[in-house]
Amino acid sequence: MKIKTILTPVTCALLISFSAHAANADNYKNVINRTGAPQYMKDYDYDDHQRFNPFFDLGAWHGHLLPDGPNTMGGFPGVALLTEEYINFMASNFDRLTVWQDGKKVDFTLEAYSIPGALVQKLTAKDVQVEMTLRFATPRTSLLETKITSNKPLDLVWDGELLEKLEAKEGKPLSDKT
């Protein structure tokens, strides 16, 4: 009988803390600026620090950014790789989704934000909604969940391109090396 009386309060406390944690995640939207689109493998600011703050989680050695505008929406710019103590970027967009309907590219509005444990993009057009949530599943695996809502058939195209330029400071190249 004592076990039941102890277990019930513990169970209630856990349930309350889990629901409070879920509600609190939205209170921390964009606490850290995770936006950016690197154009160089080593992209530094005026003080030789990284210009961008990629999202890393679970001890991962790779990270991602949120899009900084229409040219990068539909993807998570980066991928940022930790190489010893430095960050090197692999692509401005490694894999970006473009949606076509009736032979025309869908013109989306973008809402992108970070919350603890995830990067989120919501792309909205008249007849099409796309919600993309990127999370880390393990230290070596980031997963992208994509939900697409439309009443008409769509063509989905994934594209990307690796970076070729080596190094810049404040967006200005430090050398012509590739």
Language-model features, listed with the residues they occupy:
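Bacterial N-terminal signal peptides
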Residues: P9-S17
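Bacterial N-terminal signal peptides that target proteins for export
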Residues: M1-V10
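Extended, charged low-complexity regulatory segments
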Residues: I3, S19-A22
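Terminal accessory carbohydrate-recognition/targeting modules of carbohydrate-active enzymes
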Residues: H21-T178
